[in-house]
Amino acid sequence: MKEKIPFYNEKEFNEMMKKTKKGTFSGWYIINPENKSVEFSGNFNRQFKLNKPVIPVNTEYVTRKEFNEYKDSNDQRLTKIENKVDKLEVKVDKLEEKVDKLEAKVDKLEEKVDKLEAKVDKLEEKVDKLEAKVDSGFEMLAKILAAINKRLDSIEGRLDKIEPPK
């Protein structure tokens, strides 16, 4: 089983080894000068573990080459993703322009519709006025026809009273 037991520096590791002469370590360790830590991978005997309690991490040893390959593949994936995002940004910008143009067209069409509605309203008013005039004209014609019918009836009555010549 491979375990990683971190120490903050090489001095701490050496002091730990002096304190625990019973403990042994077989494996490797890397000193990282950037964050001043030491990484270990290997086998520690039980006595060493008792004197330096840590939570064991079940990991596999990864070489620098494998790590760099993994990092490169991740960089390539990130580059592809960034390129796709850039392309999508361009497409979104184009779509935004199209939407703006369409909004302008819709505004123009709304103005035209408003104008046409105003014209239709005016025409409806004119039609209502004409209907009123036609209705009043029909009423007048009906009155005139009624008057003419009365006159015809009276004329027929007079004609009936007149005796035809013999």
UniProtKB/Swiss-Prot annotation:
Q: Which SUPFAM superfamilies does this chain map to? A: MPN010-like
Q: Which residues form a coiled coil?
A: none
Specify the domain of life of the species encoding this protein. Answer: Bacteria
Entries under Gene3D superfamilies matching the protein: 1.20.5.170
- Xref: Pfam families: DUF16 (PF01519)
Q: Which InterPro entries match?
A: DUF16
Q: Which residues pair up as cystines? A: none
Please report which protein family the annotation says this sequence is part of.
Answer: Belongs to the UPF0134 family.
Annotated protein name in UniProt? UPF0134 protein MPN_138
Give the taxonomic lineage as stored in the record. Answer: Bacteria, Bacillati, Mycoplasmatota, Mycoplasmoidales, Mycoplasmoidaceae
